[in-house]
Amino acid sequence: MDSSKIKNVVNQQRKFFQTGATLPVKFRIEALKKLKANILANEKEIAAAITADLGKSETEAFMCEIGLVITEISYMLKHVRKFAKDKTVSTPLSNFPAHSFVKSSPYGNVLIMSPWNYPF
């Protein structure tokens, strides 16, 4: 993929984020469920590719890569509502009777730098 295509993809992702479609927790849960379902549906093909490319056994491919990703997705599915929930914090006496909280919300697009072949 050349730099102009990368730039185009990044711009499309930024525009999509600006629509606010990704803000609801429900959207994030559905995206994680789709990712998990696709990984599970293609588990044998992913394991075969890891075996062919890296020489890992299918067991090692599952334990160290596929299973690891599935476990992380499952963890996020279980806890994403808690992570996105507003957190009550103490309010200075000078602001009585106000209530203070920290609102968790996505910042936007991120760049993830990781090895090209791990996990799969």
Predicted segments, located by residue:
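N-terminal Rossmann-like NAD(P)+-binding subdomain of aldehyde/semialdehyde dehydrogenases
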Residues: 1-101
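Conserved small-residue-rich beta-alpha loop and adjacent elements
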Residues: 91-120
